[in-house]
Amino acid sequence: MPKYLINFVQQYASFRIHELESVARLFNIDIQYNKEDLEFIESLDPEIETPFLYVTVNSEEDIKKICTRSVLIKSVYSIWAETQLLDEILNELHSKFDKQFLSNYMINKTFKIEVESYGSKYNQKEKLEMMQKLKDSPLWDSGKCLMHPTEEQMDKHILWYILTDFGVERQGLVKDFTLLPRKVYFGQRIAKGNRDDIIKYNLSDRKYLGTTSMDPELSLVSANMGLVKKGHFVLDPFVGTGSFILVASHFGAQTVGCDIDIKAMRKEEDCNLETNFKDHGLTSQFLGTILCDNSCPPWRVNSMFDSIITDPPYGIRAGARKIGFKENRKFVPVPEGLRRDHIPQCIDYSVPDVMADLLELAAKTLIVGGRLVYWLPTTPDYKETDLPRHPCLRLITASCLQILTNRWGRRLVTMEKIIEYNDSIHNKSLLVQEDLGQFDPQHKDLRAVVFWKKMGTNEKTKKKEQKKKSVENHLKSKNNNDVINNNSNDTNSNNNCNNENNIENQK
């Protein structure tokens, strides 16, 4: 089985392996790698983190298929030599390959050499010096250098790469030449990752946009985690401006969205959620949107969706709401003639309830083997018991973490339906806490975590009391000043009257 080196993009380290495995499963590709390398690939510690991972697949076509979908893969290489010093590359190359093989390899082919580094930057002069160190190899005896090949010439064009891995923690010391790279690789590029779709679905190019529109890169990753492909039926129950179903339609799925807020789905008559589908030529994949409440969804208990992909509201930019009557309002029946256009009252919808209802919806409507992919808000105090659970769903991963601030972030949670839903057994009203999860979850009152300073409860209460006392003292002081001023004015008025009377008497 051939072995290849994957160079991942630098951000979203904790997403890399999970997206890779999901895409491999999507194409039914057997992919293997050293499990011990996961510590370095997924790490958020700059001292050990690296974007390079060796994988083994059955054929070159398999790795190329993976690259057509993965957005976190930058490039894939077939490595010919690997050392710690660039000067040793030639020795390594000549020890592994016969001289005659190297001489004949480039017959009737063109080539170009590139230099790429992780944790360092090279100027053009330094890159040329590095390339010159490889000039004595017989590999270049029969090939022809071509800097800008045409599309017709790409079939016989080889891109050779010199890759250096210094690591992030060494970045400030590299130019002093005080440290050696952790690794130096030399090989040819086999394929590029699917990074072009990020540009294609760039938020700034969309006519219909909102404050909660998901970043296109993370939307594409979410679709990959949901195993979306042509012919699938995909639902977003909190659709908003439709970022997830837009990229799901791009991959060939039939999509539908739901939301309780009609204004989120329809901005204007000529600018709405469907506008983005029209601009990308995807209207045939878009089935429409439904105005509904996810706490009482309109769907039957029927396995019909292949994937549910969503970003539920959690009260930071947009609060969650559901249909209900507020405590201070009485129930007033809607007249028969007004029911069609009636907009019902809404009340707050707690984040744990949002998550519990979402999993209930997935258990009822996903096919067995279908995936639920959603974003869960989290804090540094996250624990595994924060996760919502359901007997019909199996957790695939919840370790994909996007850190937004030092107080909170969000996790991409992926679950898979494993058994059919039975209302007499699996209805959430019949389940116990152990089945549903969310034991005192950190996302229960996320706004308090995000918008309050990190202080104890007693300190918060004390600060509130001090502020209240300060306001009361200010008002009391103001009232006293008003009384003194009024008394002073009355005294002056009386004195003026007495003076006027004295003058009259003298006259």
Curated annotation (Swiss-Prot):
It catalyses: guanosine(10) in tRNA + S-adenosyl-L-methionine = N(2)-methylguanosine(10) in tRNA + S-adenosyl-L-homocysteine + H(+). Residues 480-507 have a biased composition (Low complexity). One of its GO terms (molecular function) is tRNA binding. GO terms for cellular component: cytoplasm; tRNA (m2G10) methyltransferase complex. Keywords: Cytoplasm, Methyltransferase, RNA-binding, S-adenosyl-L-methionine, Transferase, tRNA processing, tRNA-binding. Residues 459-475 have a biased composition (Basic and acidic residues). The keyword Cytoplasm applies. PANTHER family: RNA METHYLASE-RELATED (PTHR13370), TRNA (GUANINE(10)-N2)-METHYLTRANSFERASE HOMOLOG (PTHR13370:SF3). This is tRNA (guanine(10)-N(2))-methyltransferase TRMT11. It comes from Dictyostelium discoideum.
